[in-house]
Amino acid sequence: MRLFLALLALGFAAVAAVPAYPQRIVGGSTTTIQQYPTIVALLFSRNGNTFFQACGGIILNNRNVLTAAHCPHGDAVNRWRVRSGSTYANSGGAVHNLNRVRIHPNFNRRTLDNDIAIMRTTSNIAFNNAAQPARIAGANYNLGDNQVVWAAGWGAIRSGGPSSEQLRHVQVWTVNQATCRSRYASIGRSVTDNMLCSGWLDVGGRDQCQGDSGGPLYHNGVVVGVCSWGEECALARFPGVNARVSRFANWIRNNS
């Protein structure tokens, strides 16, 4: 899920991945996995038996999935599974167990800097029209301000509201880094160069939300962000914050 700042302030960054408050798409509409075959649902179990969708992920290749570090951080690898190839959060497609989770070595559980991880599945993800490897932004990917980007996920449809069983998507825009940094500094939060802000600035109503954490932010079909955190969801003053994929291009390549 995308983490609420209230949880961070209480020091719960590590446990939120399951979350008490997972994130979902706000202000968007339903879509299908055929439109976003690079996204997967990450399933979590508290007891090792019953699994439910708690985060999103992005297919890198037939054995590796990119996600937010705060989702699996601190959990045993067998508490997470990957559902690929399904429009629905908790049914359909193929479910894969994991044999490894690699958290970025500089991940900061308090600030959520370097909020990125790679999960390795025990079985191959079969590619078809509902499951495909993503195009990932390279180190020199040029992404300007006010660019149209799209987010997708199964998260909440409003802050604190119910999650969506069907995949949803929403159009938002990239937000100037200095503006985003200033907005969050006013409430004591740090936006680093490893982060990418998006939303509908000064309007609100569109965003990623609880349960969308780890899911993709696309620019012209290229994954440029991984859903990370924000002040509630879809507020006019505070954009959503993603891990900026271009900053991690080499690490992703070397670990997948």
UniProtKB/Swiss-Prot annotation:
Residues 18-24 form a propeptide. It is found in: Secreted, Extracellular space. The keyword Oxidoreductase does not apply. It catalyses: Preferential cleavage: Arg-|-Xaa, Lys-|-Xaa. One of its GO terms (molecular function) is serine-type endopeptidase activity. Residues 25-256 form the Peptidase S1 domain. It comes from the Eukaryota. Midgut. The record marks D207 as: Required for specificity. It is an enzyme of class 3 (hydrolase). One of its GO terms (cellular component) is extracellular region. The active site is at H70, D115, S213. Keywords: Disulfide bond, Hydrolase, Protease, Secreted, Serine protease, Signal, Zymogen. Disulfide bonds join C55-C71, C180-C197, C209-C233. Residues 1-17 form the signal peptide. One of its GO terms (biological process) is proteolysis. SUPFAM superfamilies: Trypsin-like serine proteases. Its EC number is 3.4.21.4. Belongs to the peptidase S1 family. PANTHER family: AT26814P-RELATED, POLYSERASE-RELATED. This is Trypsin, alkaline A. It comes from Manduca sexta (Tobacco hawkmoth). The lineage of its organism: Eukaryota, Metazoa, Ecdysozoa, Arthropoda, Hexapoda.
